[in-house]
Amino acid sequence: MLISHDMHETRVAVVENRRLVELYIERPKRSVVGNVYLGKVRDVLPGMQAAFVDIGLEKNAFLYVDEIVAPEGVAGAPRRDIQSLLKPGQQLMVQVLKDPMGTKGARVTTEITLPGRFLVLMPFSGFVGISRKLPDEERDRLNSIIEPLVPEGVGVIVRTAASGAAEKDLQGDLEFLLRLWRRVQAQAREGLAPEVVYTEMDLALRLVRDAFGDSFRRLVVDDRRVYEKVVSFLRKSAPRLVRRVQAHKDKESLFQSYGLQPDIDTAVLREVPLSSGGHITIDKTEALTSVDVNTGSYVGRKNLEDTALRTNLEAAVEVARQLRLRDIGGIIVIDFIDMEDPRNRQEVVARLTTELARDRTKTRVSEMSRLGLVEMTRKNVTDGLYGVLTEPCPCCGGEGRVLSDTTRRIIVERSLREVLVGGKASAYLVGLNPTTYALVNAPGNNTLALLRSETGKRVNVIADPDVGPIEVRLLIEGKATAAGAEDG
């Protein structure tokens, strides 16, 4: 796991076999998933058995009746109509399940969950569950420890990370979560809707808590303050993992040193090449994501069925990786190349299922149809990399996606830093695309001044229409003088 933090954003990458398989990006406008709000019911819709709740965001949140904790406070209580549960103007505590996406507001629930390192507290559940990924013997051990500790009426899920954890560690995690819940309740009692009463951890700590464990060989962090936060968190929650945390101190950027840029570049492309010469095409719509598999230049060595099987098997691996990398959720339809032999169809689905088993996000895969179609679902929580890195294209009525202004500015400013840090000269003149030049020199953006202060080098930029939108073209490098950059 790699954590890179700079003035613009935090990026967390998961690398398997030297390939980027997961990438998470957090900018000042953070995800609100996991946040708990004291909200106010704005409208109740009996026909949809749902309600709109004002939680202080741009759009009202959407609450389904099935996401409302039953008055009895236990699972399996008789279902009731939403109009008997909620009234306009009523205040209630809700937690965000899905970020706002497009024209839709956030999706929320009243079933609050507070995650810790080993446990997830469910204050309204009364249910104790243990991760099914753990062996039966370990599940029995953990159950015997946890059940006597959990207060009556409170629910707990024991996470996979609890494997091998000592009783004192589990008890400490539970006590921390119970204290946290009491603070959330107190803030909700004293608050006035709409108001946030609990904010989820930042991206770096959240992924360290939820994902980093014994399966990772190392965790490398390139920012001193983030490194110290991560080490402090692990010392309290998983001391044995602290020795796996490393500080990146090289001049070369962390992501550069691991060669991740080519994989990042493909994460927003519609077409992704396969090593055999084939490719997959990914199209995202409001309703679903379609993935089309093509042989491209690959013609095989035997017959059409063999060519289709080999391409489909390679595509199954890449599709699973791209779904994780792009964090694509919802309904996904994969159009594999037609194959006549049912055994070949089963082999491709088995390969896809095996690759998806690495995914922490829940997926369900159907059998392949005779037409080569595989329908699957992947839990949809955020807008994925598309939502962070791109925006609707202004030239085609919003039907396409292009890199957002913020993304282009960050890429160019990061490239400028690499020029200054990696170069031996003390002054540089670089050309930028006119639109990018305007972004870098926008009022209030002091990146150039910060780069000069950080590196002790001077950089001047000019607008050059021959330069690409995210290109940094080095025009002159030399030594700094009172007049600017002198040719060296």
Question: Which residues are covered by each model-predicted region?
Answer:
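Active-site phosphate-binding and catalytic loops of NTP-dependent enzymes
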Residues: 1, 22-32, 77-84, 99-108, ...
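Charged, low-complexity terminal tails
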Residues: 2-108
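A short, contiguous, amphipathic alpha-helix enriched in charged residues
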Residues: 14-36, 87, 136-140, 257-269, ...
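Conserved glycine-centered short motifs in functionally critical loops
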Residues: 47-51, 55, 59-60, 96-122, ...
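Metal-dependent catalytic core segments for phosphate chemistry
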Residues: 64-65, 232-261, 266-271, 275-313
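A short alpha->loop->secondary-structure connector
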Residues: 70-72, 76, 103-116, 137-138, ...
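Loop/turn-to-beta-strand initiation segments
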Residues: 88-92, 155, 192-193, 244, ...
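Charged, low-complexity intrinsically disordered tails
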Residues: 127-264, 268, 382-488
